[in-house]
Amino acid sequence: MLECKSRAWMEIDTTKIAHNVEEIRKLIPKKTKIMAIVKANAYGHGDVVISKELIKCGVDFFGVSSVDEAISLREAGITCDILILGYTPPMHFHYVLEHNLIQTFFSLEYAQKAAAFAQSQQTMMRGHVKIDTGMSRLGVICQDHEYHIDDVLRIYTMAGLQVEGIFSHFSVSDDLSKKNELYTKHQIILFDRVLADVKKAGIHPGVTHLQNSYGILNYPELAYDYVRPGLLFLGVTSNDALEIRTNPSFLPIMQLKANVSLVKTIQPNVSVSYGRNYCSKDVRKIATVSIGYADGYPRAVSNIGAEVLIHGQRATIIGNICMDQLMIDVTHIDQVKEGDVVTLIGEDQGAFLAVDELTRWAKTINNDTLCFFKGRVPRIYKSE
């Protein structure tokens, strides 16, 4: 891939990461550390580059979704602890051992398989126990309707396992409505109950962690050993319209750009793009932009009023977004020409178009939007 500004590209300013990490640290207790979640290629930003920058900021623990993501970091020379948050197929347990990774043990049965494999290799597998306090996804169920503390204790004492920590995950920490605030607080109570019962059994629980990004923003006073931010060190939240309890000042590190490939004038009653969903009412000047849904720009925002920036002004996307291209109306903007830069996320001559706007047009969350953008869009990093 061309490591340069091609037909479409991302510009990622890694110098802003240190500021964002410091904003996180201002929110949490001094003794609490950061486990940076860099899954999904660091939400599309580039996991290796972002992780190395975070290490410069004092981050010493990473979380990923899968064993292959963890191996990618190891092969790039990252030696910090790495927690695999998701499922590793038993046939791939050997990678966990070979690369000194930490596996999540999310059920008694799964932990038994991990322990059996480790014993067959005459070693121990490192891991953290996952507790289901209300997400009903992965984790040993420890809720009001079922409370399987015996399974948790058996995992801790299982031959072949080296359990180094325990964690759970909030499901609605982003929602401060009374109903969901009570739900989140009950998750905290359940997690603390598990910790107390583990200690009561004479077992040290190891490192503890519960807060995701919104757990940090809305419940910063919690004093577990680690917090698990993902989007925050990238300078964004899942939804900037949500009320939060704190007032951090994060700096978005990513911009999305593309080139104009052609400018043309069309007459009245001329259709644009597939499906003929847009038809001009009068003479219009349109520009074709060299980015499309194969690059990750969502087709769902076709012809609904979504905008981009060019020459510091907003231009509307017209017609259906194509696989490799989209069209914009630039009738009101002077001197648009081939090669001009279009900003789809970011800043242009003092104007700003946030990822949140694209997210709202696409009716999703920023986590999803940032993961849209595919590998064929080069990432251009600014590091000084």
Predicted regions and their residues:
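Active-site anion/phosphate-binding pocket segments in diverse small-molecule metabolic enzymes
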Residues: 2-14, 18, 69, 88, ...
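Active-site-proximal beta-alpha core segment in soluble small-molecule metabolic enzymes
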Residues: 2-4, 8-11, 16-19, 26, ...
